[in-house]
């Protein structure tokens, strides 16, 4: 049974370990089992401050982790916490990434694209797709914003300023890579301008496409309506949407 299944009451969890991933980015590890599908999210509660949705970026049989970029009051306070401190966890919630029949059991050609802190949404997905030997592309503004770059043996890095990896964006090489690998599906999470370019590319080449969208979420279960986007509740219908849903 998933002990975090409560919709409205967070379970207080002790931070087991904290990893400094890169400049301004930390991962918080919890030694508990989580029944989680890649692309779902958990609501993280900092008592007396706020509650925010965060992707699960580490997952094993007996622990899970979330990765947090410091960029506001909530995350700044989160970054002051130390092992032994507690956070409230609700979830997991939402519709995650799917695995079509044509890529199951190591079949099919797969590409995963992460941009900036969106990389946290696709890490568990990448690990689940290891039998497919996926193409992994990661982009960030500068080298100091790249995290998880040493987590995978085969990963192509991009930076806007050329400080590490290829200067430019992951979308710059999609045409060349698709001509070589013939992708059956491309998964992505990151800045919407990047995901929009991947969407257009997949639509043009008739490639299956799934993207994780970021919206302000308050309840996580489709009640408050804060995350509605064109009639879709991102917390419940998403945060992952396929090409057909986004086309509509």
Describe each region flagged by the PLM:
Residues 1-9, 102-107, 182, 247-248:
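Short, Lys/Arg-enriched, disordered terminal segments
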Residues 17, 58, 157-159, 211, ...:
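Structural signal for conserved beta-strand scaffold positions within catalytic alpha/beta enzyme cores
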Residues 73-216:
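FNR/FR-type flavoprotein reductase catalytic core
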Residues 199-200, 204-210, 225-248:
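Iron-sulfur (Fe-S) cluster-binding segments and ferredoxin-like electron-carrier domains
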């Amino acid at each position: 049974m998933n002990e975090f299944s409560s919709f409205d009451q967070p379970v207080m969890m002790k931070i087991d370990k904290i990893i400094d991933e890169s400049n301004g980015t930390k991962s918080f590890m919890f030694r508990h089992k989580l029944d989680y599908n890649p692309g779902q999210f958990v609501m993280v509660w900092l008592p007396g401050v706020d509650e925010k949705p965060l992707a699960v970026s580490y997952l094993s049989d007996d622990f899970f982790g979330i990765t947090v970029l410091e960029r506001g009051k909530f995350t700044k306070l989160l970054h002051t916490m130390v092992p032994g401190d507690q956070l409230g966890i609700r979830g997991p919630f939402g519709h995650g990434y799917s695995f079509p029949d044509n890529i199951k059991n190591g079949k099919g050609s797969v590409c995963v694209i992460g941009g900036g802190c969106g990389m946290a949404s696709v890490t568990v997905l990448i690990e689940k797709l290891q039998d497919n030997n996926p193409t992994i592309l990661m982009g960030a503004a500068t080298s100091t914003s790249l995290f998880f770059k040493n987590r995978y043996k085969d990963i192509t890095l991009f930076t806007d300023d050329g400080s590490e990896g290829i200067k430019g964006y992951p979308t710059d090489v999609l045409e060349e890579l698709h001509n070589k690998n013939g992708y059956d599906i491309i998964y992505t999470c990151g800045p919407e301008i990047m995901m929009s370019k991947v969407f257009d590319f997949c639509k043009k080449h008739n490639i299956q496409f799934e993207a994780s969208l970021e919206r302000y979420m308050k309840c996580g279960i489709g009640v408050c309506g804060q995350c509605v986007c064109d009639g879709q509740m991102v917390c419940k219908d998403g945060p992952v949407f396929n090409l057909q849903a986004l086309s509509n």
